[in-house]
């Protein structure tokens, strides 16, 4: 696949291509994923695939962008800014941990790390559409909570990054190194609660 910077993100076949690419990338990784396999999984011709994504890197970045955007929007839709801060943060922590330890989240992370030297734009795209987008949403919520007197934070961006890092404690590390591959809802909830309590010990009022 050659280079391209513009991707048309519309149509049923486009959605088929994304679904097929997601399946193949998750199974074979970025380097191992072939155009033939992606086209077959998507149920489209190679010509159709090329018409959307002349570059495999663009396709991977679009899959990552699409999935991260979907998760971010779903999480945002469930947040009730009028609810108690502890409840909102517990929900956010569970969502973050669930994504980080999911097969998709782990595979995307591993692919970005593996391809970091050759294709640094892969990691950049994932960061911008995943962690960075999520932290921006957290920072906006923290600002609202501070205005309501529920939190006391000077640096919203730093606090958002700290909260995200607290959510990585224990389970994500185990998942990344292959020490544990499945996590119960109770484990995720407990890890989330501990992250929230630690965060509130620093920033709660």
Segments from the language model and where they lie:
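Amphipathic alpha-helical segments that line or abut small-molecule/effector binding pockets
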Residues: 19, 86-102, 106-114, 157-161, ...
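Key DNA-contact positions within bacterial/archaeal DNA-binding proteins
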Residues: 47
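Amphipathic alpha-helical segments used for helix-helix packing
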Residues: 100-125, 172-177
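Basic, helix-initiating cap at the start of DNA-binding domains
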Residues: 1-28, 32-43, 51-58
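Amphipathic alpha-helical packing segments from all-alpha helical-bundle domains
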Residues: 87, 98-99, 107, 121-147, ...
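Amphipathic alpha-helical linker/stalk segments
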Residues: 63-92, 100, 104, 108, ...
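Conserved hydrophobic residue
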Residues: 30-31, 122, 151
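C-terminal peripheral helix-coil segments that are non-catalytic and often amphipathic
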Residues: 1-4, 91, 95, 136, ...
């Amino acid at each position: 696949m050659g280079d391209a910077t513009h991707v048309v993100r519309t149509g049923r076949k486009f959605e088929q291509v994304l679904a097929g690419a997601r399946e193949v990338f998750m199974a074979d990784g970025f380097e191992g994923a072939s155009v033939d396999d992606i086209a077959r999984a998507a149920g489209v011709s190679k010509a159709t695939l090329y018409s959307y994504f002349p570059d495999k890197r663009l396709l991977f970045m679009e899959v990552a962008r699409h999935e991260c955007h979907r998760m971010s929007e779903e999480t945002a839709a469930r947040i009730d800014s009028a609810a108690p801060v502890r409840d909102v943060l517990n929900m956010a922590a569970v969502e973050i941990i669930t994504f980080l330890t999911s097969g998709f989240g782990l595979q995307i992370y591993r692919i970005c790390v593996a391809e970091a030297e050759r294709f640094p734009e892969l990691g950049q795209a994932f960061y911008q559409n995943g962690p960075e987008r999520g932290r921006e949403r957290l920072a906006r919520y923290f600002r609202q909570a501070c205005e309501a007197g529920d939190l006391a934070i000077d640096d919203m961006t730093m606090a958002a990054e700290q909260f995200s890092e607290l959510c990585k404690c224990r389970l994500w590390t185990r998942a990344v190194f292959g020490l544990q591959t499945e996590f119960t809802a109770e484990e995720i909830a407990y890890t989330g609660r501990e992250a929230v309590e630690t965060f509130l010990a620093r920033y709660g009022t």
